Amino acid sequence: MSWRPPAHNAEGQEGLWYRSVCQSHGAFCGCGDFVGHLNRLAERLGRPQPPRPPGGPPGPAIRVLPALPPAEGSPRRHNRTENQPCGGGDADFGDQRDAGDGGAAADDLSPADVEDLLDWLDAPDRSKTPKNRGPRGRCRRRLTFQGEKTPSLARLDLGRNRERSRSPRREDATGAAPTAAQRATTAQMRNPVHVPAINKNAASPPRPSYPSISPKALLFPERLPQMWTKQDWETEQQAAAVWDRPMRNNLTDPPFYPWMPRYRVSLRLGFNPQ
């Protein structure tokens, strides 16, 4: 059965309990004052005792061990068992239980225990005592290598841990100009010479190289001037006569219409051509 939250809080539950008691009293009595009825019953009958278990007379009462006497030389404390409150019940049992725990609640530490405690406080290595910190949460731990590192990794760690300065890098005062051998080595490292591939299999013959005979594909090839046919010039002549324009010397040029008015075009907004 699944748990459901209560429908009422503490005040609501007390109100429901009070109403149920009133209704149960009104079911068998018509006095109308169940509080006074309960008070009269309490004066006449007294405090009700807890119910006895069925199946015969109750067993013998359990006897509680008395408290141990206080140690010699220690100040005597006030014990609650000496002046027990009236009524007994659970309070008496709790007092006797506290007093019966070996006298720990009523006695002080023995001199030997005090000396051991002072010796432990004065010990220099008491901070090395292992402490139980409880279960450790799940978190990432950085793994550290305690052995010797390679020179390359050592340089990386040195550069990572070094603080960077905002000032520009300065050359050392003792730094001399690079020699000719150093400049040659630097140039050789910057411009490596292309080394052709070497055939690793000495038994096989070398692979011959053949010249390329396929045409070269260029992005902007050099085109030869197009040769126009007689039919192309006849079509150009007919088009010039129909649209009343001069013929073009090169058919790839845009045509020109002299009778068309000229317009000034601008991409600016609000431009008024004059």
From Swiss-Prot:
Which InterPro entries does the entry mention? HEV_TT_vir_Orf2/Gyrovir_Vp2_N (IPR004118)
* Highest taxon, organism lineage: Viruses
- Biased region (Basic residues) positions are 129-143
The record's region (Disordered) falls at: 44-190
Biased-composition ranges for Basic and acidic residues?
157-173
List the Pfam families hit by this protein, alphabetically. TT_ORF2-like
Instruction: List the biased-composition ranges (Low complexity).
Output: 174-187
Pro residues composition bias: which ranges? 48-60
From the Swiss-Prot or TrEMBL record, give the protein name: Uncharacterized ORF2/4 protein
